Structure formats: structure tokens, C-alpha cells
Regions:
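Low-complexity, intrinsically disordered or signal/transmembrane-proximal segments
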Residues: 2, 7, 22, 39-40
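N-terminal binding-site loop/beta-alpha segment at the start of enzyme catalytic domains
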Residues: 34-37, 42-119, 174, 246, ...
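Active-site mouth loops of central-metabolism enzymes
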Residues: 66-75, 125-131, 165-168
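Short, acidic/polar
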Residues: 74-85, 131-145
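Acidic (Asp/Glu)-rich catalytic clusters
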Residues: 106-116, 143-147, 205-208, 229-234
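Beta/alpha (TIM)-barrel catalytic core signal, keyed to glycine-rich beta->alpha loops juxtaposed to Asp/Glu
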Residues: 127, 158-330
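CE4/NodB-like, metal-dependent polysaccharide N-deacetylase domain
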Residues: 135-156, 181-185, 237
């Protein structure tokens, strides 16, 4: 069980220290107080006219706190993405080479007619492409498949790698240096990691020059890695959470259902709102237009501190997403 003090501290510390080799700034961002009158919108949902705030990251860019996730195994729908962009005002799309839908996504972006400069596009580097040269080639190939001249955010998908005779740390550092160069070049507006633990981030800090702008990790009522969240905030690393509905498992939990009834909101809206109120950039996935619209309508209400804590007590350290490679903590 997570301590109530730690959860409260994390919510109260939703102010991000923004720092890099040249600048240091403190930007207040109290997500728990966000509502439709806030002045941090990056897009407005067309159907409900609710503004979506943007989270500042350490290089000064801003990421919409709500995105649309994609995936493999039926986790992509051309029609749903176009609907999300045109009708729901979604501007943050998350994908990965591993999902196999970058080229299809390019078609959806084109059909939506949303200007490129209004979009935030994230994709990820698969461990099979780790290494300096292969990472560089893979990044350029992803941009080409997506039909864009630059990526807003490029992430190392997992801390593991599969290079015989070399340590994970060595390969991660070499790969990260390739990302740093693409960041300096402007091919990537921001670079980051996914599924990295504190130990991986500490090693990367020691071995490289640019601290990751983002760490994207599994985050939902049953998986609340507060130590990692707090570390990222101290180090100026924006924290993104995927799988906010726990692959649907959270939607039938009695606590979530009770809050759904109390707030007259769907169970998915309760989970997404809880995640956002914790200061987490939240990326739900859906291929159903009505679910996407529902997931966007989370800025017109707030959960009380008591109800936030009720969900906080659901932590069981349950991970629903794992990499098939061995030595994931290596």
C-alpha cells in the first residue's frame, strides 16, 4: 500500500523544476486545480469545449496532458484517429515502431488536415534498433513512415537491449548519444525514455549530456510507482503514464464504480481524471470513437482529496505490460 503522505506530497509537488545545462526555472503547475477556466490550453475538445492543459518540459516545450495511445494487435483504427483529431480536438498522438502503425498514422494525420505545428507526435525506438548507427537510421525511418520532417518526442522504448557481449548500460548510453545528436539536429524536438527505473535514469545521467525530457511508464490505480514519479519530478523529467485504465481492469473495481456514481462520470473518466490530477501526462488508448470522446471529457470536474486518496489505496504493484526480453532490470 502506498503511503497517504507520499501521494499527497506528489500531488502538491506538481510543480516541475525545469533545468538543463544552460537554464534553470521553476514553473508552477498544480494539476489538481485544473478546470475549464485554466489558462494553459493547448487544444479544445470540439464536442465539449473543454480546454486541455499543457505540461511544460525542461526544454521549454509543452505537451498536452491528455493524449491518444495506439498499439499493435488491433490497437489502431484509421477512422478513430481521424475522429479524435477532427471531432475531439486531440492533438497528442503516441505510437511506436513496434506497433507497426506509423505509416497508417501518417494517412490519418493527412486526412485530418490538422496543421503539423498543432500536433504533438511521439514515437519510440525498439530495443532491436539500439546502438548508435541503427538508432539514427530507425529514427529517420520512423519520421519518414509518419510523413513528418520532425518528431516532437522520441523515446527509447525499454531499458533492455539485445547486443551480445555488451552490457545494457553501455548500449543504452551509445543509443542515447544518437538521440542527443538527433535532438541537436532538430529531427527530434524532445527525447526521452519509456519504462526506465531510477537506476537506469541515474546511469544515463552519468553517461550522457542531456537528461531525458520524458519518462513514459505504466501508471494506473493498481500500479503507482511514486518513488519513480518523485525522482522524475526532482530531476526535471516529465512523467507520462500509459495504460491508465489498467487494460480495463480498473473499470469494474468497486471503488471506481462508487466514484463513477458519485460524480456521474464513467469509470474511465474517473481513472483518467485521477491520473491527470496526480500530475501525470495521461495516454489512454481506444479505437472506438465514442470512448475517445468520453476519455476527452475529463476537465469539467475534480476529484476531492479524499477520493484521490481512495484510489491511491488501490495500489497493488500490479504490472500489466512487460517486455519479453530478459534482464529488464539490467
Amino acid at each position: 500500500m502506498q503511503s497517504k503522505a507520499r501521494q499527497s506530497k506528489a500531488r502538491l509537488s506538481n510543480a516541475l523544476w525545469l533545468s538543463n545545462a544552460h537554464t534553470s526555472a521553476f514553473i508552477s503547475f498544480t494539476v489538481a486545480k485544473l478546470n475549464p477556466r485554466d489558462h494553459h490550453p493547448i487544444f479544445t475538445t470540439a464536442a465539449s469545449m473543454q480546454p486541455c492543459p499543457a505540461v511544460p518540459i525542461s526544454n521549454g516545450l509543452k505537451i498536452p496532458v491528455l493524449g491518444l495511445g495506439t498499439s499493435h494487435n488491433g490497437g489502431y483504427s484509421h477512422e478513430a484517429v481521424v475522429y479524435a483529431l477532427q471531432e475531439c480536438g486531440i492533438r497528442h498522438i503516441d505510437t511506436a515502431k513496434r506497433y507497426g502503425c506509423e505509416e497508417a498514422l501518417a494517412g490519418s494525420l493527412l486526412e485530418s488536415r490538422v496543421p503539423r505545428e498543432d500536433l504533438w507526435i511521439t514515437t519510440k525506438l525498439w530495443p532491436g534498433d539500439y546502438g548508435y548507427q541503427s538508432a539514427t537510421q530507425a529514427c529517420r525511418a520512423s519520421a519518414a513512415r509518419l510523413g513528418v520532417e520532425y518528431l516532437d518526442l522520441y523515446l527509447m522504448h525499454w531499458p533492455d537491449c539485445t547486443v551480445p557481449g555488451r552490457s545494457n548500460r553501455e548500449v543504452r548510453a551509445e543509443t542515447w548519444r544518437a538521440l542527443e545528436e538527433m535532438y541537436d539536429e532538430g529531427l527530434c524536438r524532445a527525447i526521452g525514455v519509456s519504462n526506465f527505473l531510477v537506476s537506469h535514469l541515474e546511469e544515463l545521467k552519468e553517461d550522457c549530456g542531456v537528461v531525458p525530457h520524458v519518462n513514459q511508464v505504466e501508471f494506473h490505480p493498481f500500479q503507482q510507482p511514486w518513488e519513480l514519479v518523485e525522482y522524475c519530478r526532482r530531476e526535471g523529467i516529465a512523467f507520462e503514464g500509459y495504460c491508465p485504465l489498467a487494460k480495463g481492469q480498473a473499470l469494474t473495481h468497486p471503488v471506481i464504480l462508487e466514484l463513477s456514481k458519485k460524480y456521474n462520470r464513467s469509470a474511465s473518466q474517473i481513472c483518467i481524471r485521477w491520473s491527470i490530477q496526480n500530475g501525470v501526462i495521461t495516454i489512454p488508448k481506444s479505437t472506438k470513437p465514442h470512448r475517445i470522446l468520453e476519455n476527452c471529457q475529463v476537465f469539467g470536474f475534480m476529484l476531492s482529496e479524499e477520493d484521490m486518496d481512495s484510489i491511491g489505496r488501490l495500489h497493488t504493484d500490479t504490472k500489466l505490460v512487460r517486455l519479453s526480453y530478459p534482464l529488464w532490470k539490467g
